[in-house]
From Swiss-Prot:
It is a multi-pass membrane protein. Residues 221-230 have a biased composition (Polar residues). It holds the Pfam family TB2_DP1_HVA22. Keywords: Cell cycle, Cell division, Endoplasmic reticulum, Membrane, Microtubule, Mitosis, Transmembrane, Transmembrane helix. GO terms for molecular function: microtubule binding. Belongs to the DP1 family. During gastrulation, expressed on the dorsal side of the embryo and then in the neural plate and neural tube. At tailbud stages, expressed in the somites, neural tube and otic vesicle. This is Receptor expression-enhancing protein 4. The chain crosses the membrane at residues 1-21, 35-55. Residues 167-261 are annotated as: Disordered. It comes from Xenopus laevis (African clawed frog). It is found in: Endoplasmic reticulum membrane. GO terms for biological process: cell division; endoplasmic reticulum tubular network organization; mitotic nuclear membrane reassembly; nuclear envelope organization. Coiled coil: none annotated.
Amino acid sequence: MVSWIISRAVVLVFGLLYPAYASYKAVKTKNVRDYVRWMMYWIVFALFMTVETFTDIFIAWFPFYYEIKMAFVVWLLSPYTRGASLLYRKCIHPTLSLKEKEIDSYIIQAKERSYESFVNIGRKGLNIAASAAVQAATKGQGALVGRLRSFSMQDLRALPDDTPIHYTDALYPDEPQLHRRPMGFPTTSQADSDSMDERWSDSEIAETRTAARTRGGMPSKSLQRSQSLRVSKKKGLSREVSTKTTKPRAKKKPAQSEPEN
């Protein structure tokens, strides 16, 4: 554990931080020789980090593994040994020059395939989004039709007044059912009637009953009053007739006989 911590510290300080600062100085001074030196170092160190990823998994049990790794990093960086320049010129540069065309062709194929795969993934994503939008539109249309049907006259006629309406929203089926009375329905309950025709017949019967009551009730007083007026008129006429009949008739004077001569 201690050797692992020390090796990680050596790799970070001598393998990354110091070469990064030296590369900054080379860029600042614009020294071509330093450019070449540190470019070779970074190529070798990149390969070292790639190999280290696998060796830490499979060869970490090897004795003095971390010590060998620390010594290798110092050997690459030391200005006396110049291990990075040696490895690059003896091994890396000849290998890359031989395999350069194959590597370039692989890179081009990878770019083309990645572009094609990206386009295919984009098309699939657009198709999925379009299908989801269509499904959402159909669900919304179904919910709208359901709400309009809840306010249609046929459904309102089919339901009695005393029973509440249980309406479920198509978009939110898990919500509790809504209890409400449709617009335009009276609040009074009509338990005996089952259809609008029966209700209209009941209303007509009620109107006839009220008309009969009015005939037998309040209008009878008006009839009595009219009858009393007629009776009073008849009485007045009889009185006039009686007064006319009771007037004394003027007696006719007897005709005087002429004197006889």
